[in-house]
């Protein structure tokens, strides 16, 4: 990896692709939440957000937060999460960006935001890259 300083959320040890996924996802913060949507600019729900972000990297994920829990490989909890990992909750899915934080299409009221990853009980962490 390059020694040039970079402004990023990712910590060392994160995969380059995972970091790229997190950085790409972060540019959509502030955009709207729309149930059933998958547009990163005009409105998406939680799984549509994850699906559309990963589609940019050539990865096809289901438009379903529960189905996302079986994608990729299992990660042993938030303590071992890396940038780009899927963080799965009951009825919800988010992207881990590092430093204990996630980016996600949260609610119609908030839209796409950054939150603490432990804001509710984590069911699974899944690594795609």
Locate predicted features.
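...with weaker cross-activation on analogous glycine-rich loops/strands in unrelated enzymes
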Residues: 51, 59-118, 129
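Intrinsically disordered, low-complexity
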Residues: 1-32, 121-129
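Residue-identity detector for threonine
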Residues: 8, 19, 41-44, 73, ...
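Catalytic cysteine-centered active-site loop
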Residues: 11, 24-83
């Amino acid at each position: 990896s390059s020694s040039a300083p970079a402004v990023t959320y990712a910590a060392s040890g994160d995969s380059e692709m995972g970091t790229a996924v997190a950085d790409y996802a972060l540019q959509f913060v502030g955009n709207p939440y729309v149930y059933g949507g998958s547009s990163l600019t005009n409105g998406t729900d939680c799984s549509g957000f994850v699906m559309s972000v990963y589609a940019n990297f050539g990865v096809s994920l289901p438009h379903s937060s529960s189905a996302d829990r079986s994608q990729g490989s299992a990660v042993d909890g938030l303590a071992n999460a890396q940038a780009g990992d899927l963080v799965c909750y009951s009825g919800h899915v988010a992207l881990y960006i590092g430093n204990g934080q996630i980016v996600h299409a949260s609610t119609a009221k908030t839209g796409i935001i950054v939150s603490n990853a432990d804001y509710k009980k984590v069911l699974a962490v899944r690594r795609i890259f």
